[in-house]
């Protein structure tokens, strides 16, 4: 088993007095991530004037938005997508997941580096690279960023018709996405790849933001902790998700461990259809179970890629059924 962990710069402790001191760059984000610098709110407002009412001085006197306010977070995302990725029309239904874009972008940049390891160190670019987004969600974030940064084409699967329709609307209303993003409804929710990947279809990688929690109560407890860190003190029994999220987006029976183990098990029958299978992993304690599942599945290689956003460490696990020689052959056939 191979574990790849990039160097992660340590963040200096911050002393809080009258005003909090923030670094000009966000510690740990991938070097190619467009969001390494602090948010330039005047520039974002120029691109998306609707953001302006949500921008105001915070408790430390810095210009920001209230990250505990779902409407503010949603509008910030809209501005970021318009300013950095040229997306003119973006919206999601109320209460659906509105993910922090810098972290999602990091996943894609590290995924690009992973594909480069199978291609003599060169990142494959263009529409010849096909990515499967498992659970694309209502927000369509991964295709938006992946297409802008690397020119990849995407297929997005989804079990929720409302999410799929939202993603479809985003694709249809933005000409840059129309010919590069396909959407598929998973009509059998008990499956992940079955019913989505065709018999002769090829994907260079899959990615997934799995439902992390094992129950609704666990998801709500996580939200309370986040709101407390944002300085909101006591919160309601059923707190409002600042980044949104419907049940199927946030939790499933057995949590991320059960979901990703199932993904590994299903990937066996799709071994020749995909070069790299990947999934985000929220909890470090989940990793041994995933490694064990990969060993039972007979994978050729497993990698753990760690990422950092400030003091928060995240990671994704990647596995392939192709050895080094087969990876090189795959790259030669599809990317050159």
From Swiss-Prot:
GO cellular component: cytoplasm
Protein EC: 2.1.1.181
Recorded catalytic activity of this chain's protein: adenosine(1618) in 23S rRNA + S-adenosyl-L-methionine = N(6)-methyladenosine(1618) in 23S rRNA + S-adenosyl-L-homocysteine + H(+)
MF terms in GO: 23S rRNA (adenine(1618)-N(6))-methyltransferase activity
Key word Ribonucleoprotein present: no
Signal peptide region: none
Pfam families: Methyltransf_10 (PF05971)
Location(s), subcellular: Cytoplasm
UniProt cross-references to SUPFAM superfamilies, sorted A to Z: S-adenosyl-L-methionine-dependent methyltransferases (SSF53335)
HAMAP family: 23SrRNA_methyltr_F
Name the record gives this protein: Ribosomal RNA large subunit methyltransferase F
Gene name of the encoded protein: rlmF
């Amino acid at each position: 088993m191979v574990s790849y962990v990039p160097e992660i710069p340590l963040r200096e402790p911050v002393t809080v007095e009258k005003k909090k001191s923030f670094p000009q760059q966000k510690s740990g984000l991938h070097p190619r991530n467009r969001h390494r610098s602090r948010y330039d709110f005047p520039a974002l407002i120029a691109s998306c004037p609707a953001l302006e009412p949500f921008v105001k001085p915070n408790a430390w006197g810095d210009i920001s938005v209230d990250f505990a306010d779902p409407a503010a977070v949603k509008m910030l995302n809209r501005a970021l997508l318009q300013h950095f990725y040229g997306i003119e029309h973006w919206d999601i239904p109320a209460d659906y997941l509105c993910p922090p874009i810098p972290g999602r972008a990091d996943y894609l940049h590290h995924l690009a580096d992973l594909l480069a390891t199978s291609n003599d160190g060169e990142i494959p670019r263009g529409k010849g690279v096909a990515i499967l987004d498992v659970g694309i969600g209502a927000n369509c974030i991964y295709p938006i960023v992946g297409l802008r940064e690397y020119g990849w084409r995407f297929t997005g699967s989804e079990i929720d018709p409302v999410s799929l329709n939202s993603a479809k609307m985003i694709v249809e209303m933005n000409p840059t996405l129309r010919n590069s993003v396909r959407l598929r409804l998973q009509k059998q929710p008990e499956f992940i790849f079955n019913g989505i990947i065709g018999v002769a279809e090829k994907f260079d990688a899959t990615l997934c933001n799995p439902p992390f929690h094992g129950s609704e109560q666990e998801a709500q407890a996580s939200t309370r902790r986040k709101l407390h860190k944002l300085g909101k003190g006591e919160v309601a029994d059923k707190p409002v998700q600042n980044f949104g999220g419907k049940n199927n987006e946030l939790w499933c029976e057995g949590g991320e461990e059960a979901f990703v183990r199932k993904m590994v098990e299903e990937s066996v029958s799709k071994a020749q259809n995909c070069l790299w299978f990947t999934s985000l992993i929220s909890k470090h304690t989940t990793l041994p179970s995933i490694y064990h599942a990969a060993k039972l599945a007979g994978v050729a290689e497993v990698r753990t890629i760690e990422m950092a956003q400030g003091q928060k460490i995240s990671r994704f696990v990647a596995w392939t059924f192709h050895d080094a020689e087969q990876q090189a052959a795959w790259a030669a056939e599809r990317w050159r």
